[in-house]
Structure formats: structure tokens, C-alpha cells
Amino acid sequence: MDKHYPVIDTRSIVMRWGDMDAVGHLNNTYYFRYLEQIRLDWLESLGHGIDPSGCGPVLAGTACVFRKEITYPATLDISIELEKLGRSSLKLRHHFYRRDDPGVVYASGEVTLVWVDYQAGKSVAIPEDIRAAVETAAKSAA
């Protein structure tokens, strides 16, 4: 998960005191919550919120490798990188950086999203405007 792909966006998250576990570092479940939050923010910035009556992404897979502990306080910059753009799926990679330590990767993550018709429960093509935005951002980053 160390490989870097074209960065199509970067989002920031401010760690909260309650995001720590008893050991005093960011609880491992919050890495996944942070990925979820930046993913939803990014999709909303493209004009696509979650509409349970229509079509949208579902999480088909996710993983995270914890490289260095993150302690409070911290502002995190999390990259959104394009690994693969398919007909109905999108594979993204992520790197977690502390704003006060920008050259160090604290964690690496990945997610696979599949666009589905929520009512029919079947995969559908990624909307053309999302596809175009992702392709344009990936070309600009290359």
C-alpha cells in the first residue's frame, strides 16, 4: 500500500480528543471513519450526495496499514488517489499525513467503491460527471 497514485483531491480532518483510545493515540476505527468522511465530502463536492432512493456508491472493500501512531492534537491531510476507474467501480488509495509533519506517511488506506441502484441492488455505471471529474483530476496530477 506504499505506492502512490495520481492525487485527485486532498481533504483535511481535525482529530478530536474523543477519537483517541486508552493508549493515547488515534483509535484504529477512526482511520476508517475518517476515510468515510473525506469520501462523502469529496462526492458531495462533485454534486453527488447519498440518495437512498437512487444510485450511488457502496463500499465493496477497505484496508488500512498503520505506519506511525497519531496523537492528539493533530490536523490530518488525507490524499484521495486514483488507482483504478472501472465501469461501475472506483479503487482509491489514501495516505494520512499530519499537517505539522507533512513528509511522513502515518497510515495508508484503500477503498473500493461500486456504484449500485439501491432499490434494484445491481451495479450501474459510474455517473459521467464523476467519471469526467476523476479523469480530469488524474490527468492534471500526472
Language model features with spans:
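Catalytic strand-loop segment that frames the active site of acyl-thioester-processing enzymes
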Residues: 1-41
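HotDog/MaoC-like acyl-thioester-processing domains
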Residues: 2-7, 11, 70-72, 83-142
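Generic structural detector for well-ordered beta-strands
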Residues: 12-16, 65, 112
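Hydrophobic pocket/interface hotspot
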Residues: 24, 80, 121
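Short, flexible helix/strand-to-coil boundary loops that buttress conserved ligand/catalytic motifs
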Residues: 27, 46-47, 138
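Hydrophobic beta-strand-centered segment that forms part of the acyl-chain substrate-binding groove
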Residues: 42-91, 104-106
